[in-house]
Amino acid sequence: MNTIQVIIFAVVLVLTVTVGQADEDSPEASLLRKLKEAEASLFGQNLEESRNSRQKRCGGVDAPCDKDRPDCCSYAECLRPSGYGWWHGTYYCYRKRER
């Protein structure tokens, strides 16, 4: 009796392994993979185009900046100070003037 159970278990195991490998290439699996790829691309695109996302790590007003590589916020520009800070020789972020 024990031998028959082992043989049946081995046959069922072999059939499960061979049939299980064929299911990976099924139309449902490929459709699911394509949908996940499309969702990932759309989700990433929405994150890049979102106007509600904050600008990160930018120098605010009166923060030192580099003239060659300004890191001021979008509402500021990198200018040389005209008043009390001109002797430092560095540039600072100032609010953009409306023209």
Swiss-Prot record:
One term of GO molecular function: sodium channel inhibitor activity
UniProt-listed InterPro entries: Toxin_22 (IPR012627)
Cell compartments where the protein resides: Secreted
Cysteine-cysteine disulfides: C58-C73, C65-C78, C72-C93
Alphabetized UniProt keyword annotations: Cleavage on pair of basic residues, Disulfide bond, Knottin, Secreted, Signal, Toxin
Superkingdom of the source species: Eukaryota
One Gene Ontology cellular component annotation held by this UniProt entry: extracellular region
Similarity section: Belongs to the neurotoxin 14 (magi-1) family. 08 (Ltx-4) subfamily.
Protein name in UniProt: U2-theraphotoxin-Lsp1a
Species annotation: Lasiodora sp. (strain IBSP 8539) (Brazilian salmon pink birdeater)
